[in-house]
From Swiss-Prot:
Residue ranges the UniProt entry marks as DNA-binding: 89-195
Highest taxon above the source species: Viruses
Taxonomic classification: Viruses, Duplodnaviria, Heunggongvirae, Peploviricota, Herviviricetes
Signal peptide span: none
Coiled-coil regions listed in the entry: none
GO BP of this protein: immune system process; symbiont-mediated perturbation of host cellular process; symbiont-mediated suppression of host cytoplasmic pattern recognition receptor signaling pathway via inhibition of IRF3 activity; symbiont-mediated suppression of host innate immune response
Post-translational modification N6-propionyllysine, affected residues: 406, 442
Name used for this protein in its record: VIRF-1
GO molecular function, one term: RNA polymerase II cis-regulatory region sequence-specific DNA binding
Post-translational modification: ISGylated. Propionylated in lysine residues Lys-406 and Lys-442, which is required for effective inhibition of IFN-beta production and antiviral signaling.
């Protein structure tokens, strides 16, 4: 064998590898001690471990043990990923809380006295306000203590910070709720520390974090309204002057309320006007103990989807039940005179169409967990002023339409979660959705009466 040539684990080229023995015994032998390529003749077939029945039973036991070991490993791995914990190390949640409490890093600090929200500096490297000790050192500490890789010169930038932020966003015990810029020009992200009760139930985590989502969307509507990152391609952006009179303030309050229609399989089942000014959460009801779960009571501005009506078609009824079960975490909406923002937690595809969608485009797929502006009243009002009788189009329509699809099934041949590209490809047919929502700001609904 050449010095650089590696040995072939399957023997010589062209040789037929021996089948491993599934029964218990020493390597290379059967359960009775005979070689694996020569069946044992000490017992007749079907009698004892070396027989046909014994080998099959031993093989089934071995397969079950392997499947159990793989299942336990997968469960442990998912738990380790969700909590950020590893052997001999604390969880990511406990680690970052310890770093915030230490006060060693400028800008890494608590945002409230209850110590439920903290800031992480994220000033870009090219920004003149970038400071290594504030914006980069914590990322290097993360790599050194938890990254399981050597720290070299490449981590002098923001590479370590990017890895740390990715780990924080994957952690179930933390929730990214916003971002901002301090008075001295430094950028930061805001994370919320979830309560232990929220980590046991995914719906409870969404309900408890709904207030923070509402505040984040309200901030985007007020401050980040003209940010290019919040605008879709081809979207028209026109500012609205602030109102200072009493009538103007009342009108601003009305813009925070929404008129909602709900359709099941093409038939209207419910309509309502929301009462909360901060926002609303549309979800299906869950039968859980209110003393233990937040999700049984709902968030502020809770809107429950109606129960499944009596349908003659069992297939349609089953699809409707699956869609409502997928909407347990729900959809969050916040409205103002600057538009409507939405955060989708629906466990399935949700398509929407409104005047923020380009005129030559069809319904778009809502991203999961990301604030998205789905309606701009300024576009509707400006278009109405320019043309009293505009052509029928979703750009000139005063409402938003949402199609809630059933969960995307993962095939038996692909046990992994679908990639975003595959997910979008499977969700391309929005017409299959059996739950449809029509959402309109209250002032526009009042004007149409």
């Amino acid at each position: 064998m050449d010095p650089g040539q590696r040995p072939n684990p399957f023997g010589a080229p062209g040789a037929i590898p021996k089948k491993p023995c599934l029964s218990q015994g020493s390597p290379g032998t059967s359960g009775s001690g005979a070689p694996c390529d020569e069946p044992s003749r000490s017992e007749s077939p079907g009698e004892g471990p070396s027989g046909t029945g014994g080998s099959a039973a031993a093989g089934d036991i071995t397969r079950q043990a392997v499947v159990a070991a793989i299942t336990e490993w997968s469960r442990t791995r998912q738990l380790r990923i969700s909590t950020g914990a590893s052997e001999g190390k604390a969880s990511i949640k406990d680690w970052i809380v310890c770093q915030v409490n230490s006060g060693k890093f400028p800008g890494v600090e608590w945002e409230d006295e209850e110590r439920t929200r903290f800031r992480i500096p994220v000033t870009p490297l090219a920004d003149p306000c970038f400071e290594w000790r504030r914006d980069g050192e914590l990322g290097v500490v993360y790599i050194r203590e938890r990254g399981n890789m050597p720290v070299d010169a490449s981590f002098k930038g923001t590479r370590g910070r990017r890895r740390m932020l990715a780990a924080l966003r994957r952690t179930r015990g933390l929730q990214e709720i916003g971002k901002g810029i301090s008075q001295d020009g430094h950028h930061f992200l805001v994370f919320r520390v979830r309560k232990p009760e929220e980590e046991q139930c995914v719906e409870c985590g969404v309900v408890a974090g709904a207030v923070h989502d509402f505040n984040n969307m309200a901030r985007l509507l007020q401050e980040g309204f003209f940010s290019p990152g919040q605008c879709l391609p081809g979207e028209i952006v026109t500012p609205v002057p602030s109102c200072t009179t009493a009538e103007g303030q009342e009108a601003v309050i009305d813009w925070g309320r929404l008129f909602i229609r709900m359709y099941y399989n093409g038939e209207q089942v419910h309509e309502l006007l929301t009462t909360s000014q901060s926002g609303c959460r549309i979800s299906s009801a869950l039968r859980r103990d209110p003393a233990v779960h937040y999700c049984a009571v709902g968030s502020p501005g809770q809107v429950w989807l109606p129960n499944v009506p009596n349908l003659a078609c069992e297939i349609a009824k089953r699809e409707l039940c699956d869609t409502l079960d997928a909407c347990a975490k729900g959809i969050l909406l916040t409205s103002s005179c600057n538009g409507i923002f939405c955060v989708c937690y629906h466990n399935g595809p949700v398509h929407f169409i409104g005047n923020t969608v380009p005129p030559d485009s069809g319904p778009l797929l809502l991203p999961q967990g990301k604030p998205t502006r789905i309606f701009n009243p300024n576009t509707f009002l400006v278009g109405l002023a320019n043309s009293p009788l505009p052509a029928p189009s979703h750009v000139t329509c005063p409402l938003v339409k949402l199609w809630l699809g059933k969960p995307v099934a993962v095939g038996k041949l692909e046990p992994h979660a679908p990639s975003p590209r595959d997910f979008a490809a499977r969700c391309s047919n929005f017409s299959d959705a059996c739950v449809v929502l029509e959402i309109m700001p209250k002032p526009l609904w009042d004007a149409m009466q």
